[in-house]
Each structure stands twice: as structure tokens, then as C-alpha cells.
A protein has these predicted regions:
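A glycine- and charged-residue-rich anion-binding loop/surface
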Residues: 1-175
Length: 175
């Protein structure tokens, strides 16, 4: 998106929540300059935002699918989510076979096609783990966490993880 006025334009490439309700906007000044107390207009690039939502949500389905196909030892080691692609880094002891890749793809696509609502709840980290949420060990969590649940599977969620990111409202919105 952009932050701009008649004398200034800033192209936003990333937004991150910092302390409380403080959000940091990262990007580049495209023209002009800005002074303290200047009025500005904020515009969201909705297509980019929707793409990032879809890819970010897909990482959760991919993670759980990998765990179901390859084993529960699989853990996320990192990811890159952009408006045109995603990369998902994970632990596993050996190369993945073509058959395993097909099974993972099948799991992800079947959950997307079920058109399940994506649910978020706020709870304590202890409650989240008791409710089956997958937490990344080594991460520090506050008194409350956001729990994301996706893909209703016969009364159970396909994926439940702690996550504060932006997500689709329904798995079908992934694409």
C-alpha cells in the first residue's frame, strides 16, 4: 500500500506489530518528504494483501499436511510469504519422494476445497496447548495468544496453531 499526501509518497512493503497497538511500516520514500503532524492518506493494496493472506494461510495447511504424511517429527523452521509465492522450510531426515509430495498436495487441496471457515480465538498459551494448538518451541509468548484453526474435519480442525498473522476467512479463499 501507500502512505501519501500532496507532497509525499511512501510505498509500504511490510507492516509489523511492535508494542501494544504500535505498528511499524517499512518501505521506500517514492517522492518528497514529510513533517511531523502532516496529514496523510493510507491506502491498502488489497490484491497484494489478499494474496499474502492466502499464501500465509496455506503455510498452516502445508505444515499439518507434511506432519500427517511424513510424521509428527516435522517442524517448521521458517517461511517466506510474499504476494506471488511462498517458501516453507521444515525439518525432515531424508529427501521427500514424489509419492509423498502428491499425498501432501492432496491433503492441502482437499482441505481448501471443503470451504471451511478459518477460526481465531484468544487464550492463554496453556489453554492453547490443551486445545491441541501447535506451538513453536523456543518462541516466547505473552499472557494471551492468538490460536488459528482451519479446515473442519468431521468435527475436528485439520490445523490448529498459534499465529498472529493475517489469514483468509475461509479455506476456499486460498485458491
Amino acid at each position: 500500500g501507500t502512505i501519501s499526501n500532496e507532497n509525499f509518497e511512501f510505498e509500504v512493503s511490510d507492516v509489523q506489530k511492535k508494542l501494544g497497538d504500535l505498528f511499524a511500516h517499512y518501505g521506500k520514500v517514492k517522492k518528497g518528504s514529510i513533517k511531523l503532524n502532516d496529514s496523510v492518506e493510507l491506502k491498502i493494496d488489497t490484491q497484494r494483501r489478499n494474496n499474502i493472506r492466502a499464501y500465509h494461510s496455506a503455510t498452516h495447511l502445508l505444515h499439518e499436511s507434511l506432519r500427517r504424511v511424513l510424521g509428527e517429527h516435522v517442524t517448521q523452521k521458517g517461511s517466506l510469504v510474499q504476494s506471488d509465492r511462498l517458501r516453507f522450510d521444515f525439518s525432515h531426515m531424508k529427501p521427500i519422494s514424489e509419492e509423498e509430495i502428491k499425498k501432501v498436495e492432496f491433503h492441502v487441496n482437499s482441505i481448501i476445497q471443503k470451504k471451511s471457515d478459518v477460526k481465531t480465538r484468544i487464550m492463554t498459551p496453556k489453554e492453547a496447548v490443551e486445545n491441541g494448538a501447535l506451538a513453536l518451541f523456543g518462541e516466547k509468548y505473552g499472557e494471551e495468544v492468538r490460536v488459528l484453526s482451519m479446515g473442519d474435519e468431521e468435527g475436528q480442525f485439520f490445523s490448529t496453531e498459534l499465529c498472529g498473522g493475517t489469514h483468509v476467512l475461509n479455506t476456499m479463499d486460498i485458491g
